[in-house]
Regions:
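Short, small-residue alpha-helix embedded
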Residues: 163-174
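Glycine-rich loops and low-complexity Gly/Arg-rich segments
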Residues: 42-46, 76-80, 107-109, 150-153, ...
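Catalytic cores of nucleophile-dependent amide-cleaving enzymes
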Residues: 98-164
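A conserved mid-domain beta-alpha-beta active-site/ligand-binding segment of alpha/beta enzyme cores
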Residues: 175-261
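Extended non-globular C-terminal regions
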Residues: 236-300
Length: 300
């Protein structure tokens, strides 16, 4: 099956643009997903390898069926871009479906992760959804990446603004096939409104999650506190330790934990980037050999 290849780090192939829409005209909504596909039609027609489709969902069951359909199509060889035109909940905890059903972020994350896995780590997921990027807080670096790239906002979105921005984004993407140019087009599309959008690439996200883990759990101070907590929690084993023995235990504890988190890092890299199933991902994504190498990128 033909695909369009975008060549950068976090590169992805796509040959199908799906718009998942769950909006209610009776509640004053404009069918912005429907309108987006209409406006993109001439640009999509120029891409012979690209097809488009609108999937309207009325309730949670239909949403789940749509996600299963996209997963199965990806397994058959499609490389979908999935664009969501759905309300986000006021609680920022998920998607608000047309009939009032709520799909919470962990379920959304699981669904798109399955699509991404089936597509060989090629999923671009875009969210014309209020608070859509809150989904990222549930990502675990020790599990398979849920997408190649995610586009959305941590803020409330407004209909006119998102229409302008996502049209500009997809118009540029279908013209230049460059995700960074497309994102810049989105940022520049509406000078009358502040841009609250973010583009999250899977490899950059992984690096940030690992750095946060190292900073909070594996710093020199954090390891000292954990070693002291272990000794204090086991007086029968450590209560007789001299000051020098306690100091040596802390030193040994740090060394063992550093070896452990290096092993954890290597295992996480293999799982997150799906290197067993897709060894080519080693070259597709920015993957560093060690935690030291990863941390150095934040110092540059």
């Amino acid at each position: 099956m033909d695909t369009i290849l975008h060549q950068t780090k976090s590169a992805f192939e796509f040959n199908f643009l799906y718009v998942i829409e769950s909006l209610d005209v009776n509640d004053g909504d404009t069918l912005t997903g429907t309108e987006l596909l209409k406006k993109l039609k001439p640009y999509a027609e120029q891409c012979k390898a690209l097809s488009t489709a609108l999937i309207s969902v009325e309730n949670a069951q239909q949403f789940r069926e749509a996600m299963d359909f996209l997963r199965d199509k990806a397994a058959e060889g499609q490389r979908p871009v999935v664009h969501f035109e759905i309300h986000g909940t006021d609680a920022k905890d998920g998607l608000y479906i047309k009939n009032g059903d709520v799909i919470e972020w962990p379920e959304v994350l699981h669904s798109i992760s399955e699509i991404n896995y089936a597509s060989g780590c090629n999923l671009l997921a875009s969210f014309a959804v209020c608070y859509g990027q809150y989904l990222a807080q549930f990502i675990n670096a020790g599990k398979r990446m849920p997408f190649c790239i995610s586009l959305g906002s941590f803020e409330e979105l407004y209909e006119d603004d998102l229409e302008l921005r996502f049209f500009a984004f997809y118009k540029e993407l279908l013209t230049s096939f460059n995700i960074d140019k497309a994102y810049q087009a989105l940022l520049d599309a509406d000078p009358n409104m502040p841009s609250n959008y973010s583009l999250i690439k899977a490899d950059v996200l992984f690096a940030n999650v690992i750095k946060d883990y190292l900073d909070t759990q594996c710093s020199r101070t954090a390891l000292k506190l954990r070693a002291e907590d272990e000794m204090n929690a086991n007086p029968a084993k450590f209560g007789h330790f001299t000051k020098e023995q306690r100091r040596q235990f802390i030193k040994d504890f740090r060394r063992c934990e550093r070896e452990h988190h290096e092993q954890y890092y290597k295992e996480s890299v293999e799982e997150y980037f799906q290197l067993r199933e897709h060894p080519e991902n080693k070259n597709r994504f920015l993957i560093l050999d060690s935690t030291d190498a990863l941390l150095q990128t934040f110092d540059e």
